[in-house]
Amino acid sequence: MNIAVVGLGLIGGSLSKAIKQNTKHSVFGFDINESITMYAKMDGGIDQVLCDNNISQCDYILISVYPKATIEFLEEKASLINKNAVVIDCGGVKSAICDKCFDIAKKNGFTFIGGHPMAGLHFSGYKYATADLYNGASMILTPNNTDNIKLLEEVTAFIKSLGFSSVTVTTPSEHDRIIAFTSQLAHVVSNAYVKSPQASVHKGFSAGSYKDLTRVARLNENMWAELFMENKEHLLFEIDHLINSLSEYKEAIENDDADTLKTLLKDGSDRKKSIDY
């Protein structure tokens, strides 16, 4: 098959390398930065440069750019896409993308499926892309139609051929609701946590807890700002819930209320055990 990869950063670049390493498919790649596209070709990450003249030859089109850019790309190229092609985006929010792209696909006769590979690094760019980034990872899919079992089986088989160990099928709204907690809130908290005045003198005083909590503080502010704003309703709910929870801990400590503090700590510990086991 011919696989197009649009956007050759960490996610897209790793997809192209995974396809090259794990399959015999040909990769047609494109990045808005022409030098990255050329480097990926010289590096062996892609076979050909994706363009208007060959996009119709692609069986799968994997789009790995920001949400708004995903919609713009699909609007611009929709008439050139093969009617039998499957287009999958890799954005971190799904409702904003799927609401537009389902309609674009329907009008132009191809299939669009929302996607979100649950893997990444705290670095960005093609130079950090690796063929094994997705080994053992989960891929979330948000199709417009879950009745086409044959198509979902084919897409799942293709995705797993790249190293993913599991595929989760859900709706765009459910994805956004849960991802606000599991990913977006974690990035907000991590990024805010390192703004403590003590952060600059942490060396020699920090170990696993500090590393765990600050791992995702270093981020791409342009991408994450867009993701947060596109999912603001769900993210604000999670932020408010966290603020309320922190207020309970703060109040117990301020009032020297050890019993309440112990209860809060035990509740959190028990909650962790119940959701992980």
Each predicted region: which residue ranges?
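NAD(P)+-binding Rossmann beta1-loop-alpha1 motif at the extreme N-terminus of oxidoreductases
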Residues: 1-52, 60
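Alpha-helix C-terminal capping/helix-to-coil transition sites in glycosyltransferase folds
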Residues: 56-57, 136
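Rossmann-like NAD(P)(H) cofactor-binding subdomain of soluble oxidoreductases
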Residues: 75-127
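N-terminal Rossmann-like NAD(P) cofactor-binding module of classical short-chain dehydrogenase/reductase
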Residues: 61-62, 88
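Internal alpha-helical scaffold of NAD(P)-dependent oxidoreductase catalytic cores
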Residues: 131-215
